[in-house]
Amino acid sequence: MSKLKSSESVRVVVRCRPMNGKEKAASYDKVVDVDVKLGQVSVKNPKGTAHEMPKTFTFDAVYDWNAKQFELYDETFRPLVDSVLQGFNGTIFAYGQTGTGKTYTMEGIRGDPEKRGVIPNSFDHIFTHISRSQNQQYLVRASYLEIYQEEIRDLLSKDQTKRLELKERPDTGVYVKDLSSFVTKSVKEIEHVMNVGNQNRSVGATNMNEHSSRSHAIFVITIECSEVGLDGENHIRVGKLNLVDLAGSERQAKTGAQGERLKEATKINLSLSALGNVISALVDGKSTHIPYRDSKLTRLLQDSLGGNAKTVMVANVGPASYNVEETLTTLRYANRAKNIKNKPRVNEDPKDALLREFQEEIARLKAQLEKRSIGRRKRREKRREGGGSGGGGEEEEEEGEEGEEEGDDKDDYWREQQEKLEIEKRAIVEDHSLVAEEKMRLLKEKEKKMEDLRREKDAAEMLGAKIKAMESKLLVGGKNIVDHTNEQQKILEQKRQEIAEQKRREREIQQQMESRDEETLELKETYSSLQQEVDIKTKKLKKLFSKLQAVKAEIHDLQEEHIKERQELEQTQNELTRELKLKHLIIENFIPLEEKSKIMNRAFFDEEEDHWKLHPITRLENQQMMKRPVSAVGYKRPLSQHARMSMMIRPEARYRAENIVLLELDMPSRTTRDYEGPAIAPKVQAALDAALQDEDEIQVDASSFESTANKKSKARPKSGRKSGSSSSSSGTPASQLYPQSRGLVPK
């Protein structure tokens, strides 16, 4: 049975980082004041008047920029980890704006012992506690996951594209299906697991943070402890420590996020808004519904917020005036979270404890190994009874051998048996009185015995190695408890824890004194004169008036914040309505009514996966259809042995299940012929045809030219050169009618 415990509030601490280089260069003012002793954080309005009172918030503990990592761990987180080691569930998560130091608080700086965060310090704490424990067995497992754009990814898996599903069981609550878990035996191993996961985590650069976490990461450590109770039986306690590093809320105008970074920021802000709504609903006593299912982050933190867990919330803020709105929002949510009530209980004897499975498997293997050793002992006794007439000396030797064998001297036993078989083999080979066949038979028997002996030895060694491997995963403390250094370290840690507890009590007492100061002053006030009474009451009136103004300013800020949230919700609603109208328009115009009604009838909402699905059309849709049975001999139909033999002997169609009639192919007559190429190339043939072609005769009509020449000769005067002139005149038309050779044309 689980031990029930009274409800306790979520413990909330605030940590303020120092001003960074960009804020100093831009000359921003420091508007956050931290009072570590009183546990108060005050925020001044950078745009307000000089008389305006700062807004003050009180928490369980506050830490300024001078706080060390180990101080934060010893005072705030060490008691929670101690509770996990006792069997409670515990959660530590950092909340706040991007760039305020959440990852630094949770992980710190690697390689620097003084700047290690909560996660590495918790590793040392857990394994140191295990090494100092007595009469207890521990099993430590580690898992690492991230929520990136509302998708769960296993950071320790080789396949980073695989998306995991959230499931819920009545006995264990919400869990991640198929999440890998690694058994770790030391701080070095669990740090290696964390480093592998950090390499796969989504990180990006924005204007506000160079190494901004773009996903919510959860490192889960499961510690199982087995201890013998008063009833003499083993009882197992299981504690689970969730170390959550949330991505920071951010505004697009400040971070300059675009493209993929803007999509990431949208999903981050949605999940953080869902977390804020869960916190508000848990604090508000009127809420009947807690919206855990609004995001995967709130579903995973369901036990941590109002459930079976002890929770510490670290609110990280920045001191610059540039981020005053985000700082106030973070402090308001953290102030609300103080009022969340959890009901933690010790998880005793769960059904799915891996430690119990390990113990049962080790016990089974040991019983199997013991059974083998009993079989060997019985065989020795039989051999001893068979050779009992050999005298008392031999019996004494065998008893001595048995004592040695029972004293875990197994190697000597195997060696002795092997040497004995070798001697017997040698004796058979050297014995010339035996027939060759008999000798071979005896040698084979001895070889078989040696092989059986070898197999038995290998099986025993394998069982022993398996037992050692499984026992090595179970951590048992008390081995170094006598060590003086270890004892001194233990005393030192106890003193540090006492100092941290004393500081916490002093802080609580001072807070109570501050709240009761006003009541005591009112009761003890006595006035010596009317003027003194007027002065004191005027002073008190001014103080109350300043408080009234601060409350009015707080109400005004809350109203403005409410208006902004309402406007954002209205904008989201309008976008969703517009998208819904578009989908309805497409359905009405492009999808038939019958198909629409079929889809509407099949649609249902899956609450576990948080989205709509379709019922299968038939019951067998998700099952594999059964195939027709196939013949064992390769035929399409099953055939008997007689039918197969008849088919081979006689080519009859009676016993054939396929290819009953064997026909030759009926080839058609040929309708084409082979191509024959020309004897002479086509270009050469064309040139020859052109050269051998007959040319047409050219006929020239010169009658018109002759009549013209005769007329000219009659018109000329007579002279002594008649013949010459006539020859020249007659030669002129001939030169015009017939072309003359120009000789060789130059290239």
Swiss-Prot record:
<feature type="compositionally biased region" description="Basic residues">
    <location>
        <begin position="711"/>
        <end position="721"/>
    </location>
</feature>
<keyword id="KW-0770">Synapse</keyword>
<keyword id="KW-1186">Ciliopathy</keyword>
<dbReference type="GO" id="GO:0098978">
    <property type="term" value="C:glutamatergic synapse"/>
</dbReference>
<keyword id="KW-0966">Cell projection</keyword>
<dbReference type="GO" id="GO:0072383">
    <property type="term" value="P:plus-end-directed vesicle transport along microtubule"/>
</dbReference>
<dbReference type="GO" id="GO:0090307">
    <property type="term" value="P:mitotic spindle assembly"/>
</dbReference>
<dbReference type="GO" id="GO:0015630">
    <property type="term" value="C:microtubule cytoskeleton"/>
</dbReference>
<keyword id="KW-0682">Retinitis pigmentosa</keyword>
<comment type="similarity">
    <text>Belongs to the TRAFAC class myosin-kinesin ATPase superfamily. Kinesin family. Kinesin II subfamily.</text>
</comment>
<dbReference type="GO" id="GO:0005737">
    <property type="term" value="C:cytoplasm"/>
</dbReference>
<keyword id="KW-0067">ATP-binding</keyword>
<dbReference type="GO" id="GO:0005871">
    <property type="term" value="C:kinesin complex"/>
</dbReference>
<dbReference type="GO" id="GO:0031267">
    <property type="term" value="F:small GTPase binding"/>
</dbReference>
<dbReference type="GO" id="GO:0005873">
    <property type="term" value="C:plus-end kinesin complex"/>
</dbReference>
<dbReference type="GO" id="GO:0008574">
    <property type="term" value="F:plus-end-directed microtubule motor activity"/>
</dbReference>
<dbReference type="GO" id="GO:0008017">
    <property type="term" value="F:microtubule binding"/>
</dbReference>
<keyword id="KW-0175">Coiled coil</keyword>
<feature type="modified residue" description="N-acetylserine; in Kinesin-like protein KIF3B, N-terminally processed">
    <location>
        <position position="2"/>
    </location>
</feature>
<dbReference type="GO" id="GO:0097542">
    <property type="term" value="C:ciliary tip"/>
</dbReference>
<comment type="function">
    <text>Microtubule-based molecular motor that transport intracellular cargos, such as vesicles, organelles and protein complexes. Uses ATP hydrolysis to generate force to bind and move along the microtubule. Plays a role in cilia formation. Involved in photoreceptor integrity and opsin trafficking in rod photoreceptors. Transports vesicles containing N-methyl-D-aspartate (NMDA) receptor subunit GRIN2A into neuronal dendrites.</text>
</comment>
<feature type="region of interest" description="Disordered">
    <location>
        <begin position="374"/>
        <end position="412"/>
    </location>
</feature>
<dbReference type="GO" id="GO:0007368">
    <property type="term" value="P:determination of left/right symmetry"/>
</dbReference>
<dbReference type="GO" id="GO:0043197">
    <property type="term" value="C:dendritic spine"/>
</dbReference>
<feature type="modified residue" description="N-acetylmethionine">
    <location>
        <position position="1"/>
    </location>
</feature>
<dbReference type="GO" id="GO:0007100">
    <property type="term" value="P:mitotic centrosome separation"/>
</dbReference>
<protein>
    <recommendedName>
        <fullName>Kinesin-like protein KIF3B</fullName>
    </recommendedName>
</protein>
<dbReference type="GO" id="GO:0005929">
    <property type="term" value="C:cilium"/>
</dbReference>
<feature type="compositionally biased region" description="Acidic residues">
    <location>
        <begin position="393"/>
        <end position="411"/>
    </location>
</feature>
<feature type="compositionally biased region" description="Low complexity">
    <location>
        <begin position="722"/>
        <end position="735"/>
    </location>
</feature>
<feature type="coiled-coil region">
    <location>
        <begin position="346"/>
        <end position="579"/>
    </location>
</feature>
<feature type="domain" description="Kinesin motor">
    <location>
        <begin position="9"/>
        <end position="340"/>
    </location>
</feature>
<dbReference type="GO" id="GO:0016020">
    <property type="term" value="C:membrane"/>
</dbReference>
<dbReference type="GO" id="GO:0016887">
    <property type="term" value="F:ATP hydrolysis activity"/>
</dbReference>
<dbReference type="Pfam" id="PF00225">
    <property type="entry name" value="Kinesin"/>
</dbReference>
<dbReference type="GO" id="GO:0042073">
    <property type="term" value="P:intraciliary transport"/>
</dbReference>
<keyword id="KW-0493">Microtubule</keyword>
<dbReference type="GO" id="GO:0016192">
    <property type="term" value="P:vesicle-mediated transport"/>
</dbReference>
<dbReference type="GO" id="GO:0030496">
    <property type="term" value="C:midbody"/>
</dbReference>
<keyword id="KW-0206">Cytoskeleton</keyword>
<keyword id="KW-0225">Disease variant</keyword>
<dbReference type="GO" id="GO:0120170">
    <property type="term" value="F:intraciliary transport particle B binding"/>
</dbReference>
